[in-house]
Curated annotation (Swiss-Prot):
It comes from Helicobacter pylori (strain ATCC 700392 / 26695). Its cofactor is Zn(2+). The keyword DNA damage does not apply. Its EC number is 6.1.1.3. This is Threonine--tRNA ligase. One of its GO terms (biological process) is threonyl-tRNA aminoacylation. Belongs to the class-II aminoacyl-tRNA synthetase family. Binds 1 zinc ion per subunit. The keyword Cytoplasm applies. The gene is thrS.
């Protein structure tokens, strides 16, 4: 079965076999007329077809178990697939095994999956009395609607689908949740069931292993266990409290970044947390982003709490006159921003209402875009390398609705392409995915569990300089408008630390670990030596703790191991008398001895190994 053709690919579109036969693109065995074959395997294109059909298998099984069920949409998403539906029956996660069993029954029946095309009038009649299907059709233009059938079940769908349910053997329903109809909280709440599907048993097994591993690495769980951060209902949802260990971790990253930014010619700046609404009207945020902002009134004047740092940096630029000799100007700020997120989407540190961006804005001429972006790409590589992240880039180009001259857009986009080419970076292109005011590069990192995360962005902006009438004097003594480059490499410290925690499973590398060394005196007479060693390490900028509670030695060692501290030193008579230290090194997975002076030199050099 692994070599069977299940679909073809042409012009960036997956076409299922039934449709491909009609179009002369396949004879059912091989791809024809320049199309790319899609075989039954765990490749991305094949999985899209497999998971789409598994969503229909889920709906078919739900209809069999709950006859009054009505279905909205069942798309393929990054984490598998889901189906939104409603029924008068109460369904909980405890029902998922029963639903899954019914899915396996239908799969074993080897039902042919066929397609029929109806006019709008025919489709409305076919699904008469089904308000959810009518809601789907109301969002679709044209007069052709696909309906896929398998056994007695049929559903409105554009495809693509497998030719038969016999292909669906390796799937798992993963969770149940609520979802508003069409994502609008003013509409009724539907039930959403998520699932995953693969072509092979190995694919499913590996995925389920990753899910279990992800649960162990969940940053919300690690945040509590390692004492990094917390949330408090009395303070409010989405507003994290950084505990001492988490703040130490964060400060280390901030300090490393600041050192690198200063060396790279960035100037630190700081804008206010609240700004008059007048400037948000000039920037366009008031008209286009108001629902995500918080407002207050002071002396009968409306102010907006900043959701972004760009306006403050523009005002820094406007605080002085500039000539072409001043450019590029690079301003950076660890800017605290607030955005109104719905409570349902808040998720640990990954999605919060207050967060701090590693934000920078570069004001430069058009001719400097490529060199500035190239420098940002170099900086990005060094940061990702330090944290052992692989990453990819995606270039988003001009959308249909945009401002600016075609030649200006082309010039800006080519500058980004040339910068990527200069660094030999393979990148994807998201045609039309740019902002209305300029092209951008998105930085997507891959963690240890092979999950992709959107973090940083490099955004060329030709809009805000125009709105705020920014200018510099060029070499011909004429006023010229600068280009503004928004850039954040980590995205936000909150989000990045959440990803970092899960990437390392809490086993942070030595250079950023919130506690780098644990000192464990065996008894009271060794305590003075431990404190002396602690001071020597602190002078070398090492985060160190003395575990001196009245517990057994084994218990103190276990505590240090649970806290995932990179180095543990047990201090007894021998260590105090000889000053030869016994070291448990997590990174080396080894225990060894080292003279005190040599150890101090070693940890000092370890702190110098990493720079951005």
């Amino acid at each position: 079965m692994s070599a069977e053709l299940i679909a073809v690919y042409k012009d960036e579109q997956i076409i299922d076999l039934e449709s491909a036969k009609v179009l002369g693109l396949s004879d059912g065995i091989k791809a024809l007329n320049g199309t790319e074959p899609i075989y039954f395997d765990d490749s991305p294109l094949a999985l899209e077809v497999i998971r789409h059909s598994c969503a229909h298998l889920l709906a078919q099984s739900l209809k069999a178990l709950y006859p009054d069920a009505k279905f909205f949409v069942g798309p393929v998403v990054e984490e598998g697939f889901y189906y939104d539906f409603k029924t008068s029956s109460k369904i909980s996660e405890e029902d998922l095994p029963k639903i899954e069993a019914k899915m396996k029954e239908f799969a074993k029946l080897k039902l042919a999956i066929t397609k029929e095309t109806l006019t709008r009038e025919q489709a409305l009649e076919r699904f008469k009395g089904d308000e959810l299907k009518h809601a789907v059709m109301s969002k679709i233009g044209g007069d052709a609607f696909g309906v896929y059938q398998q056994g007695e079940f049929e559903d409105l769908c554009k495809g693509p689908h497998l030719p038969n349910t016999r292909f669906l053997n390796h799937f798992k329903l993963t969770k149940l949740a609520g979802a508003y109809l069409g994502g609008d909280e003013n509409n009724e709440m539907l039930i959403r069931i998520y699932g995953i599907a693969f072509a092979t048993k190995e694919g499913l097994k590996d995925y389920l292993f990753q899910i279990e591993e992800a649960k162990k690495r969940d940053h919300r769980k690690l945040g509590v266990e390692l004492g990094l951060f917390s949330f408090d209902d009395e303070i409010g949802a989405g507003l994290p409290l950084w505990l001492p260990k988490g703040a130490r971790l964060r400060k280390r990253i901030e300090d490393l970044l600041s050192q690198a930014l200063l060396l790279r010619g960035y100037e630190p700046v700081k804008g206010p947390e609240i700004l008059k609404s007048d400037v948000w009207k000039i920037s366009g945020h008031y008209d286009n982003y108001k629902e995500n902002m918080y407002f207050t009134t002071i002396d009968e004047q409306e102010y907006g709490i900043k959701p972004m740092n760009c306006v403050g940096h523009i005002k820094v630029y406007q605080s002085a006159l500039h000539s072409y000799r001043d450019l590029p100007l690079r301003f950076y700020e660890y800017g605290v921003v607030h955005r109104h997120e719905k409570s349902g989407v808040l998720h640990g540190l990954l999605r919060v209402r207050e967060f701090t961006q590693d934000d920078a804005h570069i004001f430069c001429s058009f001719e400097q875009i490529q060199s500035e972006v190239s420098a940002i790409l170099d900086f990005t590589h060094k940061i990702m390398q330090a944290f052992d992240f692989s990453y990819e880039m995606e270039l988003s180009t001009r959308p249909a609705k945009s401002i600016g001259d075609d030649k200006v857009w082309e010039k800006a986009t080519n500058a980004l392409k040339e910068a990527l080419k200069e660094h030999r970076i393979d990148y994807k292109i998201d045609e039309g995915g740019g902002a209305f005011y300029g092209p951008k590069i998105d930085i997507k990192i891959t963690d240890a569990l092979k999950r992709k995360w959107q973090c940083g962005t490099i955004q060329v902006d030709m809009n805000l300089p125009e709105r705020f009438k920014l200018a510099f004097t060029n070499e011909y003594n004429h006023a010229e408008q600068p280009v503004m480059i928004h850039r954040a490499i980590l995205g936000s410290f909150e989000r990045f630390i959440a990803i970092l925690s899960e990437h390392f499973g809490g086993n942070f590398p030595f250079f950023v670990a919130p506690t780098q060394i644990a000192l464990i005196p065996i008894n009271e007479e060794h305590h003075v030596f431990a404190l002396k060693l602690k001071e020597a390490l602190k002078k070398r900028d090492i985060f160190v703790e003395v575990l001196d509670k009245n517990d057994s030695l084994n218990k103190k060692v276990r505590l240090a191991e649970k806290q995932k501290i990179p180095m543990i030193l047990v201090l007894g008579n021998e260590e105090v008398e000889t000053e030869i230290l016994s070291i448990r090194d997590r990174e080396k997975q080894d225990q060894y001895k080292m003279p005190l002076k040599e150890f101090l030199n070693m940890v000092e050099s370890k702190m110098q190994e990493v720079s951005f």
